[in-house]
Amino acid sequence: MFDNKKFNLKSKFEGFDYQIQTLISAKNLEYAAIFHEQGLGKTKIAIDLGLEWIKENIVDSVIIVVKKGLIKNWEDEIKIHSFIKARVLNNDIVNNHEVFCSPARFILMHYQVAIKEKDRLELFLQSRKVGIILDESQVIKTPDSTLSNTFHDLSDYFTRKLILTGTPIANRPYDIWSQIYFLDKGKSLGESYLEFKNNTDLTNDLHENDLGRDTFIDSLSKINK
């Protein structure tokens, strides 16, 4: 949509081998999940992946959704690892109008902005090719929340999708369902949250059900395929 020649889309620094391998594995996928533990540089991988999407004209822009308190951290990380200046969607309607109308390549916003700006986001996503990266994606683990439903509703409009978290499952295996549903709309873990929950609830016999455990593990293995 916009001339990429005006932007330096190179990464400032080469990643570690495992970061490069993760990037190679994910860059041609319509959706992917990175569940690396904290401290392994998921942010670097995500920024480099966004640059690759833009460089290859797969997307025009990348929206990165983070917890509200991490906006500044991500702005700094984008400056460190790329030559792109991120624009920020926030609670200011005028500011957001300017961002939506700009040729911004990286756009940051915190999760709650999606609820307030859902209608304009939907229009924006129909006007250009957009990739999305959800940082700390466990934020949308509750499938019947307004926040999770907002992202589920917008999901199909994104050209590329990536979720990042070091804790996709805290104490409950079914916490992962909503996050993966955002990516593939039920292809891997099914379209019914209640059915998935009943099959993976640790209060049932999953711990001693070999077939149930194997089915759960097999479902997770399909996420990036």
Could you tell me what each predicted segment is?
Residues 29-49:
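Walker A/P-loop
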Residues 33-37, 63, 162:
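Short hydrophobic/aromatic beta-strand immediately N-terminal to the Walker A/P-loop
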Residues 59-61, 76, 80-83, 102-103, ...:
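Conserved P-loop NTPase motor "coupling/switch" region that bridges the ATPase
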Residues 93-128, 142:
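Conserved helix/coil segment N-terminal to the catalytic DExD/H
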Residues 124-126, 139-152:
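Substrate-gripping "pore-loop 1 plus following alpha2 helix"
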Residues 135-136:
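Walker B catalytic acidic pair
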